From Swiss-Prot:
This is Cytoskeleton protein RodZ. One of its GO terms (cellular component) is plasma membrane. Residues 1-111 are cytoplasmic. Its main location: membrane. Residues 151-163, 180-195, 210-241 have a biased composition (Polar residues). One of its GO terms (biological process) is regulation of cell shape. Residues 19-79 form the HTH cro/C1-type domain. It comes from Yersinia enterocolitica serotype O:8 / biotype 1B (strain NCTC 13174 / 8081). Keywords: Cell inner membrane, Cell membrane, Cell shape, DNA-binding, Membrane, Signal-anchor, Transmembrane, Transmembrane helix. The keyword Transmembrane helix applies. It is a single-pass type II membrane protein.
Length: 338
């Protein structure tokens, strides 16, 4: 019997038995140890029964045992030999190769994703460029069409304005013809020997009047023919006629200044302006730096090829063209609508 008892005492104690004995010596329960170590009661029970959880790594298991030993004041050196036998450190599986292969797959997938993204970006850029080019070509074609139409209208208007230019030149003809008549007046008295040739136009008229009054009744028809042409244009040179067109021009300028349309060009621009009566005031291309002042019957219909190339002022107020400039398109607007 004594031999059997001594054999039982010589049986080596395990880590779980040593921890349980130390816990009982301090009067602690498994619940109290679990609360202090922030572990489950089942984990404390498995440690005391020398059971290792299958889903728990050996590193964590050894860490729990060390924390338990510190709590019950057991030296760590005493438990390490037993712990090495009961819970040997298991070699980790070859995880780096798996992670490398996963990383390679991720990189391959990221490469395809980036290629697809760049393809979409290039397609969007290409479509945007094509859309802009089509709009640009359409605007250029529209401007060329409007320029052709305006040139045709100008040619028609030019053919109709030929009689007007002839009428305007007719009043100027008497003025041109009066000058030689006035120059011829001094020569007439010279032939008669009454007034010297160096006299002015006014003394020449006086001399001619004197010749007519002092001439005898038997004056020949040739002399009267020479004197009468010099006297015939005299009423046309009267000072009462020039103020009449001047007054009319002043009234016209005052009436048209109220509806004046001023355009300052910063670059070359095609422009067409039509007033309320349907008259084309201007149609063509203006150079940069030019100023165009138009007057007609309001409202005005404007067609501008490049809205950003000019500024418009109507009745002293600027006309807003910002929406056409932002849209980068031909501007069609009406100015002077009440």
């Amino acid at each position: 019997m004594n031999t059997e008892a001594s054999q039982d005492q010589t049986v080596p104690e395990t880590t779980g038995v040593r921890l349980r004995q130390a816990r009982e010596a301090l009067g602690l329960t498994q619940q109290m140890v679990a609360e202090r170590l922030c572990l489950k009661v089942s984990t404390i029970r498995d440690i005391e029964e020398d059971k290792a959880q299958a889903n728990l790594a050996s590193t964590f298991h050894r860490g729990y045992i060390r924390s338990y030993a510190k709590l019950v004041h057991l030296p760590e050196d005493e438990l390490l030999p037993m712990l090495a036998k009961q819970a040997p450190i298991r070699a980790a599986k070859v995880a780096p190769m798996q992670s490398f292969s996963l990383g390679k797959k991720h990189k391959k997938r990221d490469g395809w994703l980036m290629s697809f993204t760049w393809l979409i970006v290039l397609v969007v850029l290409g479509l945007t460029g094509a859309w802009w080019w089509q709009n640009h070509q359409a605007q250029q074609a529209e401007i060329v069409t409007m320029a052709d139409q305006s040139s045709a209208q100008l040619s028609q208007n030019g053919g109709q304005s030929v009689p007007l230019s002839d009428d305007n030149s007719d009043p100027a003809n008497p003025v041109d013809t009066q000058a030689p008549v006035a120059n011829s007046q001094p020569s007439t008295p010279t032939e008669n020997g009454t007034v010297p040739a160096t006299s002015s136009a006014a003394p020449a008229d006086t001399a001619n009047n004197g010749v007519n009054t002092t001439a005898p009744q038997g004056t020949t028809s040739a002399e009267s023919a020479v004197v009468s042409p010099s006297q015939a244009p005299l009423p046309s040179v009267s000072t009462a006629q020039p103020p009449l067109p001047t007054a009319d021009a002043g009234v016209t300028g005052t009436a048209s200044s109220a509806d004046s349309l001023v355009m300052n060009f910063t670059a070359d621009c095609w422009l067409q302006v039509v007033d309320a009566s349907g008259k084309t005031l201007f149609s063509g291309i203006q150079k940069g730096g030019a100023t165009l002042n138009l007057s007609g019957k309001a409202p005005y219909k404007l067609t501008i090829g490049a809205p950003g190339a000019l500024t418009i002022t109507y009745q002293g107020n600027p006309v807003d063209l910002s929406k056409f400039i932002k849209a980068n398109r031909v501007a069609r607007l009406t100015v002077g609508v009440e």
